[in-house]
């Protein structure tokens, strides 16, 4: 679905319906699978925990399994840090991953109700997240919301509004 490449030629690929994380492929020998990177975790509500504690094994087997969400988009900055956005992951929809796959944004980002569609970074380490509804959210590198702009175009084709966002990029200035 989405792919970024670091300075060493290592590819990071978001694969549809893959719950193991981002696929990491080395350029060695025509492409060597290195493993998975930046895995999302499945969140479980208190209600689900209580249900599972009181249900029989047969009833639990019929419950929907709790699988982690697949990232929807990713980006890489000049330092090699990987950024991902994931729909349906309330507290960790935006991640800033180091080389070990550890999220550097502590506490998660939950400043918006929209579905994140794309992510990129700017020259000052700011992070830009575009929602599928046309809003652009700008965060600092710690994941603190700086401001929101844009919106959904209602057919009037006004400047700064979008009907559906699929990617985002910022210029070098």
Segments from the language model and where they lie:
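Short loop/turn segments immediately following the C-termini of beta-strands
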Residues: 8, 16-18, 27, 79, ...
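Conserved beta-propeller blade signature
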Residues: 10-13, 81-84, 126-129, 137, ...
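Short loop/turn segments that connect beta-strands within beta-propeller blades
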Residues: 26-30, 97-102, 140-144
């Amino acid at each position: 679905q989405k792919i970024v490449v670091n300075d060493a030629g290592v590819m990071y690929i978001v694969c549809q319906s893959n719950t193991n994380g981002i696929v990491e492929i080395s350029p060695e020998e025509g492409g060597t699978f290195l493993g998975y990177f930046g895995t999302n975790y499945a969140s479980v509500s208190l209600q689900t925990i209580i249900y599972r504690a009181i249900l029989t094994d047969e009833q639990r087997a019929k419950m929907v399994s709790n699988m982690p969400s697949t990232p929807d988009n990713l980006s890489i900055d000049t330092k090699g840090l990987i950024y991902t956005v994931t729909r349906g992951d309330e507290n960790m929809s935006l991640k800033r991953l180091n080389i070990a796959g550890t999220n550097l944004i502590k506490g998660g980002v939950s400043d918006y109700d929209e579905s994140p569609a794309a992510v990129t970074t700017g020259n000052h380490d700011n992070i830009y997240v575009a929602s599928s509804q046309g809003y652009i959210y700008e965060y600092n590198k710690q994941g603190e919301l700086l401001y929101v702009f844009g919106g959904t175009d209602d057919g009037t084709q006004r400047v700064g509004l979008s009907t559906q966002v699929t990617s985002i990029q910022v210029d070098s200035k």
